[in-house]
């Protein structure tokens, strides 16, 4: 039988692994064939069966396996009795304190030895297939993902197959060509026959693919992977010429102008396109050619296939100018660049330059790369360049950084959310005002943040490689990851500012002010002319370049953009920093905050909310915006944007006192409630805190009492909160599952409620008695 174990901070014994902080923050799963007691194995199997039975009711998993492991290792038992609020009963201070303490103790018990909180950060169903395809075409699938891994991959695929036989872009999505074709190919590569798979999974999937025209209708991102596999032809893909790397960096089409994630995907993919790399045409590949196309492979008009896309995958239509651009490259540029003499001079030089960038990014990120999509393409490119080379071996050693195991099987995450979740968890615990009770937990969390702050800028001449400085800032996952993010920096900075005001006997050695100054410098560097904040690098390319967005299912991916929630986090952090260290760049910070507030006001929707890009959606954006505006001194009385936002939140409150928003808001940009007007506890927490920041407790606390009651009564017996719909978002169309959110935000909201609502009520009551 065996069990899976989550390991923390390991890697020092692998000669192909490097780290700047001794692997602090690294989380990897290992299968122990002889591990686990019979009771433990039964518990895991019960969790798997419960998930599968209820998978169409709640699509994201509860991420139970590592939590069961940690709670068992720490011998955790919830000792604080549960108290619920009955109908007609007022919430008192003791009841909410009881719920807060129960949740805080549960959160403390799930903290890792490194000080962060492990968690699943996934949902895009398409993350997994490129890894299976990539490892298959280079011949390393069975060594990297042996039998137990493959068993969990298949479990994951079966768990997330829709009732119609397809898979969507993410867990809650309807069937798409992209998701269905990718998962069908995975099942076949992993040994399932054309009629195999659980509940006839393969045949049901293939029927959906063929009924929608076959895989020539897969979106662009799928065409390239199927071309590498040999199930598609490269001439059916729109051009990705590596020669763009040879253009002057100021040229609009140069990758230097791109959003960093787009640039780093384009980088290795342009190399593979330039090489027209195709894996071995195995008997399986030949079978897939027959199974997935509606006509014989050699009769397909590949040039026409370049512009085909199933309507289910089409979130935004390509403008005619983009198709003209691709057609010109395909018809005129590529025939010249792939023939003598230009192929020997220009193309080969372009490919060499491209791989220089690939190797730089690999080394700068310790071969983790910015995300799973980028990682696997870089790994395949390194193998194509040199199958026995050290870069490829180092890539193999970092694959486990992306593997996550839960009760629904094995997935590939986008990237770990260690620092982001830690910064939010720490602030939630600090808000509880249980400093002595939670002291050891807070100290470990602070140690993790200190160990995760970037020690240096990217290596070498990073500006020549189109990277931004990042010394003193924080990344989304770990220090080794190396891709610095502003919102992670802002939230981590606020934690460090809180700790700077706490007794050293509780939090230990404090971060030097100079290291906080470095974080502030990074934040100040990313403000755009409109006052908004980008997240990774300054906005370089013009927004008009989005007309060339090659992905049919994502928006705003070509260049960097400003984000409401990132801007709000920056305001909060710098307001707090300015109070603690008023002498550092004070005038610049004041000007920064003024411009950022103006950006928030300008980006408010006419009906009151703000659009969030990284969370669903209007609830997420509105929570952050109200928090940022309040931090900058804006109130319900002096800022017209706040009453509009409050009106929106009050109008969308559900009957049970909560709030619930569908991921569909992201694509339509119109507020869309969850089906059945049901509530979501994480979104309820966002709305509750947003209203608290607006001063709602002073006007009418009734809506706040209703939502707090829902949170308290929804808490589970051990202090956890139940998993519900996904609450993260990726580029407008893809729901993201941040499993840690269900523990962080309800706790934070109840702590804010106790302090700012019940505390206010208590003061008012005391004043009335005294009068």
From Swiss-Prot:
Record's keyword terms, sorted: Isomerase, Repeat
Keyword Thylakoid attributed: no
PFTB repeats by residue range: 150-191, 516-561, 642-683
InterPro entries with a match to the protein in the record: SQ_cyclase_C (IPR032696), SQ_cyclase_N (IPR032697), Squalene_cyclase (IPR018333), Terpenoid_cyclase/PrenylTrfase (IPR008930)
Family: Belongs to the terpene cyclase/mutase family.
Domain of life where this protein originates: Eukaryota
EC number of the protein: 5.4.99.35
Keyword Isomerase (UniProt): yes
Gene name tied to this protein: M2
Full protein name: Taraxerol synthase
GO terms assigned for molecular function: beta-amyrin synthase activity; lupeol synthase activity
Job of this protein: Multifunctional triterpene synthase producing taraxerol, beta-amyrin and lupeol in the ratio 70:17:13.
């Amino acid at each position: 039988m065996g069990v899976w174990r989550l390991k923390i901070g390991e890697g020092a014994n692998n000669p192909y692994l490097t780290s700047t902080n001794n692997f602090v923050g690294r989380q990897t799963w290992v299968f122990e064939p002889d591990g686990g007691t019979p009771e433990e194995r039964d518990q895991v199997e019960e969790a798997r069966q419960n998930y599968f039975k209820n998978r169409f009711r709640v699509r994201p998993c509860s991420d139970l396996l590592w939590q069961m492991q940690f709670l068992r290792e720490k011998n955790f038992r919830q000792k604080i009795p549960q108290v619920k609020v009955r109908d007609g009963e007022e919430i008192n201070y003791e009841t909410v304190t009881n719920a807060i303490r129960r949740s805080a103790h549960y959160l403390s018990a799930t903290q890792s030895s490194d000080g962060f909180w492990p968690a699943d950060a996934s949902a895009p169903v398409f993350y997994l297939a490129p890894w299976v395809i990539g490892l298959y075409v280079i011949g390393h699938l069975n060594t990297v993902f042996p039998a137990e891994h493959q068993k969990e991959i298949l479990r994951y695929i079966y768990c997330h197959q829709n009732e119609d036989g397809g898979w969507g872009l993410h867990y809650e999505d309807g069937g798409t060509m992209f998701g269905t074709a990718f998962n069908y190919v995975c099942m076949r590569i992993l040994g399932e026959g054309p009629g195999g798979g659980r509940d006839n999974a393969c045949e049901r999937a293939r029927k959906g693919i063929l009924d929608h025209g076959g895989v020539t209708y897969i979106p662009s991102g799928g065409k390239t992977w199927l071309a590498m596999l040999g199930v598609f032809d490269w001439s059916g893909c729109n051009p990705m010429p590596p020669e763009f790397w040879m253009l002057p960096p100021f040229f609009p089409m140069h990758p230097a102008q791109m959003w960093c994630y787009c640039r780093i995907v384009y980088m290795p993919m342009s190399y593979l396109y330039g090489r027209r790399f195709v894996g071995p045409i195995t008997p399986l590949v030949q079978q897939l050619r027959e199974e997935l196309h509606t006509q014989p492979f050699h009769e397909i008009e590949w040039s026409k296939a370049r512009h085909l896309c199933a309507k289910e995958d089409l979130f935004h239509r390509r403008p005619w100018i983009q198709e003209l651009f691709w057609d010109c490259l395909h018809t005129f540029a590529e025939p010249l660049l792939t023939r003598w003499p230009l192929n020997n001079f220009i193309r080969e030089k372009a490919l060499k330059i491209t791989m220089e960038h690939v190797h730089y990014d690999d080394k700068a990120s310790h071969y983790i790369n910015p995300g799973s999509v980028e990682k696997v393409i870089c790994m395949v490119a390194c193998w194509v360049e040199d199958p026995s080379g050290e870069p490829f071996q180092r890539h193999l050693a970092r694959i486990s950084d992306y593997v996550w195991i839960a009760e629904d099987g094995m997935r590939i995450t986008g990237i770990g959310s260690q620092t982001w979740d830690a910064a939010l968890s720490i602030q939630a615990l600090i808000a509880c005002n249980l400093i002595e009770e939670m002291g050891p937990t807070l100290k470990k969390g602070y140690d993790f943040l200190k160990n995760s702050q970037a020690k240096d800028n990217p290596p070498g001449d990073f500006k020549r490689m189109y990277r931004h400085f990042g010394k003193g800032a924080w990344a989304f996952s770990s220090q080794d990851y190396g891709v610095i993010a502003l919102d992670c920096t802002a939230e981590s900075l606020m934690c460090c500012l809180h700790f700077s005001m706490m007794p050293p006997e509780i939090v230990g050695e404090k971060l030097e002010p100079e290291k906080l100054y470095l974080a502030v410098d990074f934040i100040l560097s990313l403000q755009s002319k409109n006052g908004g904040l980008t997240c990774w690098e300054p906005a370089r390319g013009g927004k008009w370049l989005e007309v060339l967005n090659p992905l049919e299912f994502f928006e705003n991916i070509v260049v960097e953009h400003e984000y409401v929630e990132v801007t709000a986090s920056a305001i909060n952090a710098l307001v707090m920093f300015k109070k603690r260290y008023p002498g550092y760049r004070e005038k610049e910070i004041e000007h920064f905050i003024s411009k950022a507030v103006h950006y928030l006001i300008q980006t408010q929707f006419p009906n009151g909310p703000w659009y969030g890009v990284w969370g669903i959606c209007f609830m997420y954006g509105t929570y952050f915006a109200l928090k940022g505006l309040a931090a900058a001194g804006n109130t319900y009385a002096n800022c017209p944007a706040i009453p509009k936002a409050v009106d929106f939140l009050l109008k969308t409150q559900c009957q049970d006192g909560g709030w619930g928003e569908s991921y569909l808001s992201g694509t339509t940009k119109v507020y869309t409630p969850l089906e059945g007007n049901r509530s979501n506890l994480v979104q309820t927490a966002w709305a509750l805190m947003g209203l608290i920041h607006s001063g709602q407790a002073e006007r009418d606390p009734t809506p706040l009492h209703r939502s707090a009651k829902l949170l308290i009564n929804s808490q589970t017996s051990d202090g956890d909160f139940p998993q519900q719909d996904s609450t993260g978002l990726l580029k407008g169309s893809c729901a993201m599952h941040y499993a840690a959110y269900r523990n962080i935000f309800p706790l934070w909201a109840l702590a804010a409620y106790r302090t700012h609502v019940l505390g206010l009520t208590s003061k008012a009551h005391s004043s009335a008695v005294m009068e």
